[in-house]
């Protein structure tokens, strides 16, 4: 972990208590705690991943300028998670199945009492609250994963090209239904090819690095914002394969959120 003095300087600069970013981070932490409780109740194994794990290891919590939370789980657990998770007055599980304009193969658990505007779009999403991302991992081939990603990307580009109306929505619905229906065929093709690796589920291209079971299992724990969460067995190896020298602070601090509104 970085020196406490440096950590305090970064907090003061990027996410001091009471700032919009810190309020967003605390809301994401609330969602993560709810998801953690749910996963424990249903014996669903997950772990902090990507930048969230990096924040835990390097900062003991959120990277001061970070505005998202990522968790990963194996595809079998992901399918159970999506099947068993129940929406309530505070949270909703956002997937391609309950929103025509959500064209991603992974889920978000969203807060119902906030609205965010992101660089990556989402203006047509049915649900727009603060969220955490839930990613599935499966053994697949990089080429097949990329082909599925390009298919979904073309649908998103089509959506952004035309003004919304019933005909455009109908075309999006048909193309999206066809694209997700072909995942089974792509998965079959992938199983025939050599060189499969543990990667994010077909069509997910925001994280292109492979994962390795020896780095992940058996799971251990890590401290994050004063709470204990599941983590990969070898977080150092996991992070180095993704980020290289992850203890080195980046020159540019990437932020995804443009605007936040807290409701009520």
Predicted segments with their positions:
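A short secondary-structure junction signal
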Residues: 143-149
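Short hydrophobic/aromatic beta-strand micro-patches
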Residues: 72-74
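Short, solvent-exposed beta-strand-terminating loops
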Residues: 1-4
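Short, conserved charged micro-motifs
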Residues: 79-83
